[in-house]
Amino acid sequence: MGIIHSLSPDLINQIAAGEVIESTHSILKELIENSIDAGASKIEIATESAGLGRILVSDDGHGITKEDLPLAIKRYATSKIQTFHDLEHLFTFGFRGEALASIASVSRLVIESGTEGNRMAQRVVVEEGKVVSEEEIPFFQGTKIEIKDLFYNTPVRRKFLKTESGEEKKNRTRVQTMALGEPSIGFRYVQNGKEVFHVQKEEPLERVLSIYGENLRDHLLPVHSSRNGMTLRGFISHPDFYKSSRMGQFFFVNNRSVELKFSAQILKRCYGELLPSGAFPYAFLFFDLPREFVDVNVHPQKKEVRFLSEETITGILFQGITEVLRTSTPVEFLEMRRRLSMPIPYHSSADKSQFGGEGMSMGGPGFGFGMAGRGQAVWGSQNEEGNPLLGPSSIEGRAGFSLDGIGAGTNLHLLGDNLTKHNLFVPKKHYGVIFETFILAEAEDGLYIIDQHTAHERIRYEEVLRDLKSKAYKSQSLLTPIRLELTKEEAEEMIAEKHRFSELGITLEPFSGGTILIREVPSYIDPGKETETILDLWERFKSKDPEEKELYDEMAKCVACRSAIKKGDQVSDPIIGELLQRLSYCENPSLCPHGRPTLIKLTRKDLETMFHRI
């Protein structure tokens, strides 16, 4: 007797549900896509118990006719395609006719729908994939789909889901991402009876800010790139604003949210050294492509797509991002590109332009672009009182600060009264900066090359950590509180951890919706850096749960990274002297807080060996 047999239709649907329905968030995706395809101008979503108890998605789209309602839950029944040619020219999100059939096989399903020109709407009740009742109801335009008792007949599926809070977070992320991709549609999302967010039809930038916070407004750069009828549009963040994970990166192909396997590599190449190690830019990027150029039928959940020419897409992406970085951060971008890809010209003799306090001149053909509203950061300028400043100018030209208020005329040897000298690095004199990044200095034991950013980062890290451990800082009340604009759930999560911020001298207060007020900040955070430092710290909180000792360490790293001199910043001779002297008093002057080297040493013997003198 044969052992191979055909599966029942019910079992086939349940198996298919395992491919299409990964979790409750994948159900939300399928239902919202149906609403978008139906031409909805507003979509409302409600979930209870992470969607396992109840899911309701309603829209004002064109609806489903009485004749089509029973077919809507049949597998491979669809209004989207009829021929293979249609599959190659899709204008809709859905096309397989699998979603409702799969959902109906593992839940109790109710569909209500009304279409234009009818006096009554229709209602069908479905259990285990079969229609158990049909009736007419009062008319409304659009469709409502209610799902209850998800996976009631496949309990093993429930067992492998995350915790309820984990599933709720994934649901929020899914709905927000889909709302991000459709700014011309209004969205409202309610979770366990509480409104999570509500957005009206708006422009793409406003949709990004509505969902991910007004705090992004001043840090986003518009991207636009076109080639052969293909367009890239959207926004990326300025290099001074980033996250500690890729959770702020979103990519859409013809408004469909997708995972692009090459996106991380392209972003890394484009930003390069403009970002510190472990930092990831925000990206909200949309590809508008000819339908025949994209194959969306390559993944069960349509998470991935295939392009006719991936090289073309990566080229458009690279061109769009590099162009906006070149024009928005020209000094930093120019230096990074030259270090990465251009040969350094040979000079037979050194002059002031190469090794003096003004920095090395790197001018050349093809780089004669200007800068709108942003000047090259200069460390060591004179303020109104005539004191040297150790802080880069901001976009508005804000003055910086001095390193612990030490002026150029300070007797640096007196610092030893308050600091322990470790004698690992004792500079005698310096010879300026090369490549606007590396300081050349001489000590008794050799020639040192010092990275101005990582060196200053080490200094600031140890100073802030020392202040935190000894409680030597003061918290300063702000006359005008600083507003943090976040999503509602982010604001709630942040306020729930306000005791951690309080331990660091930061006072946070909930205001309304997703707004948080910063009432007090510690003296060790530089003026103008409060928002980005606190948000950076919050990103670190979310990725781990630091104890008090680690809390101080994370805060010191955040402040050091944000306040340190950057690559490309011009540094005056007095400030170089301060920097080197301060570095010599550090407990570990050879490494930055993230483990990167701050300096390398060439001994006299090393040099003589290189020149074959010994």
From Swiss-Prot:
Positions of disulphide bridges = none
Report the CDD domains cross-referenced here.
HATPase_MutL-MLH-PMS-like, MutL_Trans
Transmembrane residue ranges? none
Q: Which Gene3D superfamilies match?
A: 3.30.230.10, Histidine kinase-like ATPase, C-terminal domain, MutL, C-terminal domain, dimerisation subdomain, MutL, C-terminal domain, regulatory subdomain
Does this UniProt record's set of keywords contain DNA repair?
Answer: yes
A GO BP entry is: mismatch repair
GO cellular-component terms in the record?
Answer: mismatch repair complex
Alphabetized UniProt keyword annotations: DNA damage, DNA repair
The UniProt family comment states: Belongs to the DNA mismatch repair MutL/HexB family.
| NCBIfam families for this protein | mutl
According to its UniProt entry, the function of this protein is described as: This protein is involved in the repair of mismatches in DNA. It is required for dam-dependent methyl-directed DNA mismatch repair. May act as a 'molecular matchmaker', a protein that promotes the formation of a stable complex between two or more DNA-binding proteins in an ATP-dependent manner without itself being part of a final effector complex.
| HAMAP family recorded | DNA_mis_repair (MF_00149)
Q: What protein is this chain from?
A: DNA mismatch repair protein MutL
Q: Which organism is it from?
A: Leptospira biflexa serovar Patoc (strain Patoc 1 / ATCC 23582 / Paris)
Which gene does this sequence derive from? mutL
